[in-house]
Amino acid sequence: MAALPASLADLEWIISRLAQRRALLTPLAPIFWRPASDASERHRAFIEHLLTEGGGLAYRTADSVLVASPRGDGWLVDDLHVRDGRWTPDGIELWNALAADRGGQDVRFVCPTYERDRAAFASSIGLTVAETWWLIELGTGGGEARLDVALPGARAITVGAPPVYAPPGPMLFLPSPENAATAVPAALDQAPELGCAGVVVNQVASDQELVETLRAAGLRPHCDYFTGTIKTF
C-alpha cells in the first residue's frame, strides 16, 4: 500500500499505531516518558484537533503513520511510527507523500537517540542534527511548571510534560547555558528542591565542548532534533 492522506476516519488506527511506539520508548526513559493513565485518550484529542483545526497533515500506509504539525514557517514531525523498522519502503513513502504536499518547506524532525534506525532515516532524507537534548532522570517530583530559575551561568525554566506523559514533576530545562561548568552542577543541586523529575540541557550541534561537561555530570544524550528541507527521495 502506497502512502495516502489519513483522515479522521483513521483516527483510532492512528492512535493505536502511535501507542505502539510510545510503549517502545517508555522503558528507555521511564520517568521522562512515563505515560499518563489516559494517554491514548489525550493523544486522540490532540490528533483530532490537529487534523481539524490545527492545520496538521497525516499520512498512512497499511502499517505505518506520519503526522506533521505546523511550526512557524515550517513543520514539526514527531508522531511518526514505522512498524517493524520498515523505513524502506514505508518511511520513504510517507515522507514522499508529505513532500508532495509541502516540498521545499522547513522541517524539524524529532529523533530520540535510542532510535538509531530513525536517525539513519533522517540522515538519508537530507536532514542534519541541529540540537540535542541531554537528560538525567531524578527520583523527585511534585514541582510546579513554568517557573523561571536563575542559575549561575544559565537561565532555566521548569517545563511540564506533553499531555500524554505524566512524570512525577516538571523537567528543569536549560535551553542555552552560558557557563555549563557552573550551571549544570547548580541545576542538579536545585532540581530536587524545585520538585523536578529530571534535568534537560539543550546542546546545539556546534557546541562540542558542552558534550564533555554534560557527560561528566551524568547526563546522557536523549533526543536529537534534525532540521532541513522537505523534499522527495
Language-model regions, residue ranges each:
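A short helix-loop-beta-strand connector motif used in the catalytic cores of GNAT acetyltransferases and
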Residues: E41-A62, V129-A130, G143-V149
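Conserved acyl-CoA
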Residues: D90-D106, T128, T182-A197
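A short beta-loop-alpha structural element at the N-terminal edge
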Residues: A2-T26, E144-A154
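Conserved acetyl-CoA binding element of GNAT-fold acetyltransferases
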Residues: R71-R86, A166-A180
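Conserved beta-strand in the GNAT
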Residues: G55-R71, P152-P163
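Conserved GNAT-fold acetyl-CoA-binding loop/helix
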Residues: A23-A45
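Conserved active-site alpha-helix within GNAT-family acetyltransferase domains
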Residues: T113-E131, A205-H222
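Conserved beta-strand-loop-alpha-helix junction that forms the acyl-donor binding cleft
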Residues: L94-L98, R108-R118, S176-P177, V200-E209, ...
